[in-house]
């Protein structure tokens, strides 16, 4: 994958929890046009509070991330710690602290180990290497089992530019504005006056906001976009298309890596009367433990799907017109022969296509999730012990 020009980074272990990478910095040689979307959880993490302040100007030049500790529910001291991290990173890189976006992910309610984080911040400049974003993708992982990376090359007036995205997330995921942690870096610029926030929000709404693993909205969700323009100007249309594709790629990688997951579920809701209706029903289906466990076990129990559609009380769907398919196989009122084929489809595929046709309108949307296994219970029952 091509790396965007002008970005340097590193990802290292500093011992926050164990011997895996847990600290990373991304730095642009010049200030970037920037925007971000954040969690709507009522208890946002300290880095989210500080990050909102710093991105308000529309300019950022660096991102600092630690994993294994989210700096959430840590009070005023947690906010002070996030500010101090930005200050020391800024001093190391020779930039204003307000040009630094902080992020933290991991266990909630535990103070940051500032005695090991601040020395790492002081060394930041000496650790930077050109590109190197795969290291950061590893450093932001918590219960993730793999790095999540996607990129696209796009045309610019002076040749070609790159958009490069990294993300983390495997549990505590049902976004409401952003989701998990995601950093998207680009060396292209956009025409003067372009609303970068609207472009990012549109891409997020078509991707991360259509994702759920366990219906829990994290306190740390952040999606940030930084563009330094070193490869020239791109059209808004080309940029938006590539950005949305990257966000969908990362969404699917997160769903595939859901804690304990064995199957990616891609759900299409079609024939909805509105996007709001499609979202409610789509999330109801993918959040249902009964649906998720049935898919895991290869059990084509179509009654559970009917239940998940029907429990959206404020969006009643006529039963007669409702159609449901796994792949191309009809589910509703399936006969024994079809049920056998459905079971084989669920058992033999790691990517499950689920199509629900409401037949009350013309709106169509895609959603992503995963199955629900014993390993999810094991992972989360003993997370802090």
Swiss-Prot record:
Listed name of the protein: Arginine biosynthesis bifunctional protein ArgJ
Family in the record: Belongs to the ArgJ family.
Chain positions of site Cleavage: 178-179
Chief location bin: cytoplasm
Organism in which the protein naturally occurs: Leptospira interrogans serogroup Icterohaemorrhagiae serovar Lai (strain 56601)
One of the GO biological process terms: L-arginine biosynthetic process
Protein's job: Catalyzes two activities which are involved in the cyclic version of arginine biosynthesis: the synthesis of N-acetylglutamate from glutamate and acetyl-CoA as the acetyl donor, and of ornithine by transacetylation between N(2)-acetylornithine and glutamate.
Site feature (Involved in the stabilization of negative charge on the oxyanion by the formation of the oxyanion hole) residues: 105-106
Single GO molecular function: L-glutamate N-acetyltransferase activity
Cellular compartments per GO CC: cytoplasm
Keyword hit for Zinc: no
Annotated substrate binding sites: 142, 168, 179, 259, 380, 385
Subunit structure: Heterotetramer of two alpha and two beta chains.
SUPFAM superfamilies given in the database record: DmpA/ArgJ-like (SSF56266)
Listed CDD domains: OAT (cd02152)
Pathway involvement of the protein, from the record: Amino-acid biosynthesis; L-arginine biosynthesis; L-ornithine and N-acetyl-L-glutamate from L-glutamate and N(2)-acetyl-L-ornithine (cyclic): step 1/1; Amino-acid biosynthesis; L-arginine biosynthesis; N(2)-acetyl-L-ornithine from L-glutamate: step 1/4
Catalytic activity, EC: 2.3.1.35, 2.3.1.1
Active site feature: 179 (nucleophile)
Catalytic activity line of the entry: N(2)-acetyl-L-ornithine + L-glutamate = N-acetyl-L-glutamate + L-ornithine; L-glutamate + acetyl-CoA = N-acetyl-L-glutamate + CoA + H(+)
Entries under Gene3D superfamilies matching the protein: ArgJ beta chain, C-terminal domain (3.10.20.340), L-amino peptidase D-ALA esterase/amidase (3.60.70.12)
One matching Pfam family: ArgJ
Subcellular location: Cytoplasm
Keywords from the named record: Acyltransferase, Amino-acid biosynthesis, Arginine biosynthesis, Autocatalytic cleavage, Cytoplasm, Multifunctional enzyme, Transferase
Keyword Transferase: yes
């Amino acid at each position: 994958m091509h790396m965007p020009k002008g970005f340097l980074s590193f990802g290292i272990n500093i011992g926050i929890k164990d011997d895996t990478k847990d600290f990373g910095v991304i730095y642009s040689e010049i200030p970037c046009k920037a925007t971000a979307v954040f969690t709507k959880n009522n208890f946002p993490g300290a880095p989210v509070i500080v990050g909102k302040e710093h991105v308000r100007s529309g300019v950022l030049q660096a991102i600092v991330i630690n994993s294994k500790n989210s700096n959430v529910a840590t009070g005023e001291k947690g906010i002070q710690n996030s500010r101090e991290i930005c200050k020391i990173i800024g001093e190391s890189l020779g930039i204003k602290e307000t040009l630094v976006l902080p992020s933290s992910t991991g266990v909630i309610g535990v103070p940051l180990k500032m005695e090991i984080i601040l020395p790492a911040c002081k060394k930041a400049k000496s650790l930077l290497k050109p590109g190197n974003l795969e290291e950061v993708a590893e450093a932001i992982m918590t219960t993730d089992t793999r790095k999540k990376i996607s990129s696209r090359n796009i045309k610019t007036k002076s040749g070609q530019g790159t958009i490069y995205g990294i993300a983390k997330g495997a549990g505590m995921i049902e976004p409401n504005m952003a989701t998990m942690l995601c950093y998207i870096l680009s060396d292209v610029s956009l025409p003067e006056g372009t609303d970068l926030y609207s472009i990012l929000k549109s891409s997020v709404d078509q991707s991360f906001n259509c994702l759920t693993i366990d219906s829990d909205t994290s306190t740390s969700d952040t999606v940030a976009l930084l563009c330094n323009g070193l490869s020239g100007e791109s059209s808004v249309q080309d940029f938006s298309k590539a950005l949305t594709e990257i966000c969908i790629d990362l969404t699917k990688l997160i769903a595939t890596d859901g804690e304990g997951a064995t199957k990616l579920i891609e759900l299409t809701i079609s024939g909805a009367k509105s996007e709001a209706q499609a979202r409610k029903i789509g999330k109801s289906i993918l959040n249902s433990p009964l649906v998720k466990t049935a898919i895991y076990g290869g059990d084509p129990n179509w009654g559970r799907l009917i239940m998940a559609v029907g429990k959206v009380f404020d969006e009643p769907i006529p039963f007669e017109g409702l159609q449901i398919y796994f792949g191309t196989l009809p589910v509703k009122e399936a006969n024994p022969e079809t049920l056998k084929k459905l079971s084989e489809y669920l058992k033999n595929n790691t990517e499950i296509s689920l199509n629900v046709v409401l037949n009350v309108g013309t709106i169509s949307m895609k959603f992503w999730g995963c199955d629900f296994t014993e390993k999810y219970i094991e992972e989360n029952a003993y997370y802090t012990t």
